[in-house]
Amino acid sequence: MQRIENINAATMTDDKGYGLIQDATVIINKGKIEFVGAAFDAPATPTAEVIDGNGGLLTPGLIDCHTHLVWAGSRANEFAQRLHGASYQEIAEQGGGIKSTVKATREASAEELLTLALERAETLMSQGVTTIEVKSGYGLDLENERKQLTVARQLAEQLPVNIKTTLLAAHAVPPEFKDNADGYIEEIIQNILPTLANEGLVDAVDAFCESIGFSPAQTEKVFKTAKDLELPIKLHAEQITNQKGAKLAADYQALSADHLEQLDEEGVKAMAENGTVAVLLPGAFYFLRDTQKPPVELLRKHGVPMAIATDANPGSSPIHNLPLMLQMAATFFHMTPEECLRGVTVNAAKALGENQRGVIAEGCYADLALWSCKDAAELTYQFGVNPLKTLWFNGVAHDRVSKPWSAR
């Protein structure tokens, strides 16, 4: 049993704000939160280990709810191309983009992919992240999608972090199905998806519904199969063009629709009606030098929960810093500090279907982060620094500096 004292706790349990408790005490027992409240209300725990928070800020452990963490290769050359004027879409149409990463990832061994992914995951953890969603989508066939998802599962075996896996086989058309997207969709729904689901490798299913990806009709076939397998769905939607993907996802009760720069009010309303979370990805917006912002005001108006994630990937968001995304979301998308912190805690948990994480509440997992700052707004305000002091995974404390969670 642990007793964390002398802290301000941002519980994230109210509707819009931080749910802040000044001079709080949190009691952890058997990996879960047994008590959270004002210090003067806390029960006696004479045998507990007492941890002095030194007046710091305690938040839920951060949740990165959209990453592509398992890949090989580099896309630095495409970064240079874009600086010379090429667009993300032009590069993709010339065989670059996702397809170049597919080639490198297929050629890499599972051991090589695990080594790369461990380093990326540890970087996120060192900044306060306790849950990471990891997508496939750089294999695009049964063998290599399995390889990616297996590596994602191995991250959770070698590190204390909570991993949620998402099958993103419908990410791009692989070379063996060139000019035959419909044929590849059939391969996904007849073989890849049911096989990997039956192997227990899939927590959710995603697709890239876009002019350079898959059509709404093709995407819907994937959704129907996922629903038949009782798997939750997510969607890359409305990043480059409006394909009405967000509405389609919402109609299938998707956990989330992600990117959303081109989202319209019809899609927002559908998301609100079906409880679909809007996952905003300011790192991709920044890196691609986009100018069309997601409709944050419409999302607010209709009460759609907004989450924030890194979209960590080699092509459009080579970023492994979730706290930086708070600052970018505030600066680029005009989100408030409260919205930003909610976006990487309670709303990010909703985007993954996690109902016992993302808040500091009795009965929930003790995934917690202690920061040296006193004001919760500082986590959004400052960037380029790391105020994390201690991280708890299921009630086990880890000091950031010593990083005793390291698998290597």
Swiss-Prot record:
Binding residues for 4-imidazolone-5-propanoate: 75, 138, 171, 239, 316
Keyword Transmembrane helix among UniProt keywords: no
Keyword Cell membrane belongs to the record: no
Cofactor(s) the protein requires to work: Zn(2+); Fe(3+)
Residues that coordinate or bind N-formimidoyl-L-glutamate: 138, 313, 315
Family matches, as Pfam families: Amidohydro_1
Catalysis: reaction(s): 4-imidazolone-5-propanoate + H2O = N-formimidoyl-L-glutamate
A cellular-component GO term for this protein: cytoplasm
Pathway: Amino-acid degradation; L-histidine degradation into L-glutamate; N-formimidoyl-L-glutamate from L-histidine: step 3/3
Subcellular localization, as worded in the UniProt entry: Cytoplasm
Domain of life: Bacteria
Entry EC number(s): 3.5.2.7
Binding site for Zn(2+): 66, 68, 236, 311
Free-text cofactor note: Binds 1 zinc or iron ion per subunit.
Binding site for Fe(3+): 66, 68, 236, 311
Any one Gene Ontology molecular-function term assigned to this protein's record: zinc ion binding
GO biological process: L-histidine catabolic process to glutamate and formamide; L-histidine catabolic process to glutamate and formate
Family: Belongs to the metallo-dependent hydrolases superfamily. HutI family.
This protein's name: Imidazolonepropionase
Annotated source species: Idiomarina loihiensis (strain ATCC BAA-735 / DSM 15497 / L2-TR)
Protein's gene: hutI
